[in-house]
Amino acid sequence: MVSPLAVKGGEALRTRPWPAWPQPAPGVPAAVAEVLGSGRWSISGPYRGTDSHERRFARAFADYHGVPYCVPAASGTAGLMLALEACGVGAGDEVIVPGLSWVASGSTVLGVNAVPVFCDVDPDTLCVSPEAVEALITERTRAVVVVHLYSAVADMDGLTRVAERHGLPLVEDCAQAHGASYRGVKVGALATAGTFSMQHSKVLTSGEGGAVITRDADLARRVEHLRADGRCLSDGPPAPGAMELVETGELMGSNRCLSEFQAAILTEQLTLLDEQNRTRRANAARLDGLLGELGLRPQATSEGTTSRTYYTYAARLPEGALEDVPLTDVTGALTAELGFPVQPCYAPIPANRLYAPQTRRRYTLGPDHEARIDPKRFALPVCEDTARRTVTLHHAALLGDAEDMADIAAAFAKVLRHGADLAT
């Protein structure tokens, strides 16, 4: 008998298209055309008598978060490295980071010659807990990075208390949380610094890009120097044709600047963010109910969360269901039914094939350092269990309607009902 599952030759549950991503804001074409004809395509281009798009976006993004300072950057990875260095992290220092995240949470720490210390996560929120972080603090700890993962906001009250008790800077990685808030404050504005990614898949995107926000003027100035080869923006307008960047020599940096094209796109895309987030939240709530009826456990968020941002919708499979089926087979079956990618949760960073410091000569800094950055030394049981049982959907699916959410639930029901077929 032929299985009804599409992955086994049956008929797919859905063939209609899903919402596309990215979705350009109405003002994007004109903004890009303006840059194209401006004669200034980067922050280091000649001043043309008006504010750069980079400055305009920095102001808009800072205002959106209620903070005085935003420094745009080339990527989220660049932003994290800039924030860490601006906080004083350097050679041999330890930085506590989540064990369940994209590999950049570890590689950025390596990139500033420091040592990532991977922390296990809370089984419900999938974010680091204050208790787990505090247990890892040593005399070599120099900073803590918290990732607001998928759709959750971490326990910022508890994490802030831990960081303050030990005199450590706390960096929020908000690459997956643009627009989320905690006790009425936007994430990124709750700690020493907040970093963001504007890579293609993010809810605020310019293809690639990033930013660092902060309330600390000195830290913002250090970030400026670090991202522009040791230069910072001038206080006033320069002469026409000159650069707005001043060579102060205060702090050596490198080039991690955002282009004018990207900044122009981001300023326009920011006008859509809240509306799109509202749509995602409403559809996620529908999906929570529908999948909960099937026994799945949607990702939770911390108690202080005011509003969530759904970069990814994550849910744990029902206990006892499909336990003998590889998770990639389950997600493959769901993808075949929906015509939309359903993915396994992130692998724990130390087990991720993309996290391989031993393949880079720049990290061979002596036996002690190499032992400290060896991924094999970390035991992360909750991360490992989560990776075996949690599936995810990209936020584009949440820009649909109630009928789309019903289709997602129907696909899960079908795969759960015929799960035995996946084991053959």
Swiss-Prot record:
Official protein name in the record: L-glutamine:2-deoxy-scyllo-inosose aminotransferase
Q: What class of enzyme is it?
A: transferase
Question: Which SUPFAM superfamilies does this chain map to?
Answer: PLP-dependent transferases
* Single Gene Ontology BP annotation: polysaccharide biosynthetic process
Key words, A-Z: Aminotransferase, Antibiotic biosynthesis, Pyridoxal phosphate, Transferase
Q: Which Gene3D superfamilies match?
A: Aspartate Aminotransferase, domain 1, Type I PLP-dependent aspartate aminotransferase-like (Major domain)
Which species does this protein come from? Streptomyces fradiae
User: Which cofactor does this sequence's record say it needs?
Assistant: pyridoxal 5'-phosphate
Its pathway, per UniProt, is:
Metabolic intermediate biosynthesis; 2-deoxystreptamine biosynthesis; 2-deoxystreptamine from D-glucose 6-phosphate: step 2/4; Metabolic intermediate biosynthesis; 2-deoxystreptamine biosynthesis; 2-deoxystreptamine from D-glucose 6-phosphate: step 4/4; Antibiotic biosynthesis; neomycin biosynthesis
What's this protein's family per the entry? Belongs to the DegT/DnrJ/EryC1 family. L-glutamine:2-deoxy-scyllo-inosose/scyllo-inosose aminotransferase subfamily.
Q: Which reaction does it catalyse?
A: 2-deoxy-L-scyllo-inosose + L-glutamine = 2-deoxy-scyllo-inosamine + 2-oxoglutaramate; 3-amino-2,3-dideoxy-scyllo-inosose + L-glutamine = 2-deoxystreptamine + 2-oxoglutaramate
Locate the N6-(pyridoxal phosphate)lysine modifications and list their residues.
K202
Q: What are its E.C. numbers?
A: 2.6.1.100, 2.6.1.101
Would the keyword Hydrolase turn up in this protein's UniProt record? no
Q: Which GO terms describe its molecular function?
A: pyridoxal phosphate binding; transaminase activity
Report if keyword Ribonucleoprotein is assigned.
no
Summarizing the function annotation, the protein's role is: Catalyzes the PLP-dependent transamination of 2-deoxy-scyllo-inosose (2-DOI) to form 2-deoxy-scyllo-inosamine (2-DOIA) using L-glutamine as the amino donor. Also catalyzes the transamination of 3-amino-2,3-dideoxy-scyllo-inosose (keto-2-DOIA) into 2-deoxystreptamine (2-DOS).
Q: Which InterPro entries match?
A: DegT/StrS_aminotransferase, PyrdxlP-dep_Trfase, PyrdxlP-dep_Trfase_major, PyrdxlP-dep_Trfase_small
